[in-house]
Amino acid sequence: ADDLKSYVWNKRYEFHYTGKTAEPEVALQMALECDKKTFVLTDSGDNTTSGSTGWNTFVLRQFLAVKNLKKNILFGSIKDEYTYKQLDKININASEMIYLGMNKDELSKSVVLNVKKLKKADIILVHGEKVIGTLGQGILVHVIGTGIDIIVTNRTARMTNTLNFEEFDINWTDYDVVVLKQGYIFPDFKAK
């Protein structure tokens, strides 16, 4: 164990993060100014692939605050089991007023949204290109009067593969911006 520790410590300066990093306000501006589809924005502060909760609404609130938002945005995903239960009771294409956000802290502050329910699907676990199980369910909603779609989940979700979005009958590359809860961008999304 000591040899491994020494080896890793001695190689620490050779590590280079390959993605772009930016503070939230700068990242938002980069997404808004990007002319190409699809801009992938990671909410790395709520990285569900390394054990975070997935319930932060901070980035969502950033986009909602943009006046005259011209882009269409997909959030994959935000965990809120209470809102999920509320949405699960209504029919597809029905509208509902929701409070999305767990209110556990400032980052997960609840936001009031008028949404239309589009689709319910399993949150699949994917290894490579193979589905190996499920981890809860999600409901895709459209925020009425905006270009924002959100997958609301009943459990912490890891959207790491295009197959996750295919479960909801959506092509993530149809969106101008996709917000994922990842630290390192997974290969399916890194090409963008």
Question: What residue spans do the PLM features occupy?
Answer:
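Catalytic centers of hydrolytic enzymes
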Residues: 144, 148-192
